[in-house]
Amino acid sequence: MHNELAHLSAYLPAIAASSPIVEGKIGPYIDNRLNFYKLCYKEVPSIVGDIIPEYVSSFEQYKKEVIGGYSIDLAKKGAAKELLDKEWMNSRGLMFRFCRSALELRILDEQECIKSDVAFSCFIRAVLRGLLSKKCEPVSHSILVSDLNSIIQNGLNATVNHPQGETARQVCLYFFKLAYENATKSEKKYLWIIKKRIEEGSISELIRGRVLNKAKTSSFKEAILSVYSPLIECLSENKPYF
C-alpha cells in the first residue's frame, strides 16, 4: 500500500493546493507551501528527500535506507543521539508511523472545511483500492518527483509524464474514475467535491485568479480580504469553496 500511495501522492497537490499568497503577494507557485516545505530541510535534505517517498519492498529496507540514511546525515551534522534512528524525524510527504501502525500523508495542503477533508479521505481510500486491485506497473520514482515539481509550479495545468495523461488534470480525472469505480456508497456521496475541484481548479488556483481580478479595481490588500472572506465562511459553515 505504501508504494501505491506514493504513486498517488505525487498528483494530490494538483487538487489540494491552497496556498497562493506569500507575504501579501501572489506567490510564484500554485502550491507555495510545498515549495517552502522543500527549502526548510536544506541543511539535511535527506530528512525530506524528494518529498515523494522512495519505493520500498520491506520494513527492513525502509528502516535501513530511509531512516538510516537521514540518521547518518544528522549524525554528521552533530545531532544528539536522541534524534537518530527516529521515524518521526522523517518529513517526506508520506511516511510510516510504526508506533501507530499507520501511514501518515503530509503532502496535502487542503485548508478548506471538514467536509472537503472527508472528501479527500474518501477519494484516497477508493483510489488505493483500485490501484491495489489493478496491480499496474509502477510509475518510476523519478517521474513522480519530476511531475510533482511541475505540479507545485503549475497545478492542474502542469505538464506531466504519467501514462494516463499529459497534464495533471488528465491524470487526476483518471484517478477520479478509478476512485468512483471502487468507492463505497457512503464514499461516493463526497466524491463530487473532488470532481468539481479537478474541473474548476484547486483552492489556490481559484483564489489566485479571483484576487488578480479584484485587484484590477481595488488595492491588492482589499482584493485579498474580499476573496478570503468567503473562504472563512466556508470553514465556519463546513461548505466547500467554489
Language model features: what each stretch is:
Residues H2-L5:
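Short amphipathic alpha-helices in soluble, non-transmembrane regions
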Residues H7, A14, S18-F242:
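C-terminal accessory/tail domains of diverse enzymes
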